[in-house]
């Protein structure tokens, strides 16, 4: 199986040779699914290396498929060229690296430079890192700040007073700050949860439970989408278990996961949506060690698709469009910086997709319907 970087090089080589290539040709040449090709093409287009056209791709306007600095633009308006963009991310390990890459590629395509600082889901640390970037002289900020907990509201109010444009990434102001005028790029996590539930129902399940990580800021949105879909489809209320678990590998995790599986067995739950990947992998591990067949006796859909394909069996997963999310956030920031007139607040939400593998007993790939 080719690595993503190898596929990208082959795609660029084919486009440089022929000038334009149809997506169906790429699927045949690469030996992967259309979904995978579309992801690869989107990433290359976000980096300014290709231009998407109906049914295919061509070289970008930059010669030879290399990014042309200073000429980037988006549906949000012209992009400020040569900008120094700051970004504060809550992690540089799970989920966020792809978001960061998407933002960095977009800034580079506009001839700018991105400066990154990592935080730790803590409002005080967020503020320290943002202050350092402001002292560095950044002209605009991408931030994924804490929105709950001690100091979060004060942090968000402070962000709203800064003289440089701020774009929230995977964050929205809480209900306490309904008029905070900050642009934002987010994922429709509630919709993603609904995709997972509807997929399990399409396979014959009439009861779908939910398992969420206690540490994830996305769990409330995933839970809201799960609840809404379970109610709208009139699924078995007795099987609609709403459970949370500690982080996979943390102290005492195995005993808690075993207890959860026992509760599912007693309630007759045979399908679960699990947020996030590591928790889903841990749950499958404990299930199989306990003699529960996956997917034969328990179907599992994971949420995040960071390491889901490495599970045994590979996990069907809801996949947020992380690279595109970072790119869109950067586009918003650069457009805001370039527009000297009064422009309205932009809040953009991207739909995730569903990647179907083996953990539910189906092997086709699909997207939102």
Model-derived regions: residue spans:
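Hydrophobic alpha-helical segments within soluble ligand-binding/sensing domains
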Residues: 173-175, 180-210, 220, 253-261, ...
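An alpha-beta-alpha
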Residues: 194-234, 346-359
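Short beta-strand elements in bilobed, periplasmic/extracellular small-molecule ligand-binding domains
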Residues: 108-118, 210, 227-254
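Flexible loop/hinge segments that line or gate small-molecule binding clefts
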Residues: 146-194, 278, 304-315
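Flexible loop/turn connectors
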Residues: 262-369
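HTH-adjacent hinge/linker in prokaryotic transcriptional regulators
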Residues: 3-6, 17-20, 41-114
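Periplasmic-binding protein-like
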Residues: 86, 138-146, 209-211, 265-276, ...
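Short, solvent-exposed amphipathic alpha-helices that sit
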Residues: 10, 95-109, 192-195, 217-237, ...
């Amino acid at each position: 199986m080719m690595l993503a970087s190898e596929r990208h090089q082959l795609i660029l080589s084919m486009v440089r040779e022929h000038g334009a290539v149809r997506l169906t040709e790429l699927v045949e040449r690469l030996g992967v699914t259309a979904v995978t090709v579309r992801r690869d093409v989107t990433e290359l287009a976000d980096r300014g290396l290709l231009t998407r056209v109906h049914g295919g791709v061509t070289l970008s306007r930059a010669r030879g498929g290399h990014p042309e600095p200073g000429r980037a633009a988006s549906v949000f308006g012209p992009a400020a060229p040569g900008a120094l963009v700051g970004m504060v991310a809550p992690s540089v390990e799970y989920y966020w690296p792809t978001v960061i890459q998407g933002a960095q590629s977009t800034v580079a395509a506009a001839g700018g430079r991105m400066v990154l600082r990592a935080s730790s889901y803590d409002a005080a640390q967020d503020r320290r890192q943002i202050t350092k970037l402001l002292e560095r002289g950044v002209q605009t900020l991408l931030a994924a700040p804490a929105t709950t907990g001690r100091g979060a509201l004060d942090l968000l109010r402070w962000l709203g007073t800064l003289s440089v444009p701020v774009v929230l990434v995977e964050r929205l102001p809480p209900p306490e700050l309904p008029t905070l005028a900050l642009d934002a790029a987010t994922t429709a996590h509630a919709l993603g949860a609904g995709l997972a539930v509807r997929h399990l129902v399409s396979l014959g399940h009439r009861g779908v439970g939910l398992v969420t990580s206690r540490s994830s800021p996305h769990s409330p949105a995933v839970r809201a989408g799960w609840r809404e879909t379970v109610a709208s489809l009139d699924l078995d209320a007795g099987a609609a278990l709403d459970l949370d678990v500690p982080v996979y590998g943390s102290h005492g995790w195995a005993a808690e996961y075993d207890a959860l599986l026992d509760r599912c067995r007693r309630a007759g739950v045979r399908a679960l949506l699990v947020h996030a990947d590591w928790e889903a992998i841990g749950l499958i591990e404990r299930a199989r060690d306990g003699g529960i067949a996956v997917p034969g006796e328990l179907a599992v859909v994971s949420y995040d698709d960071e390491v889901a394909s490495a599970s045994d069996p590979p996990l069907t997963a809801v996949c947020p469009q992380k690279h595109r999310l970072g790119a869109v956030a950067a586009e918003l920031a650069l457009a805001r910086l370039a527009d000297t007139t009064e422009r309205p607040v932009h809040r953009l939400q991207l739909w995730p997709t569903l990647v179907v593998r083996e953990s539910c007993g189906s092997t086709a790939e699909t997207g939102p319907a």
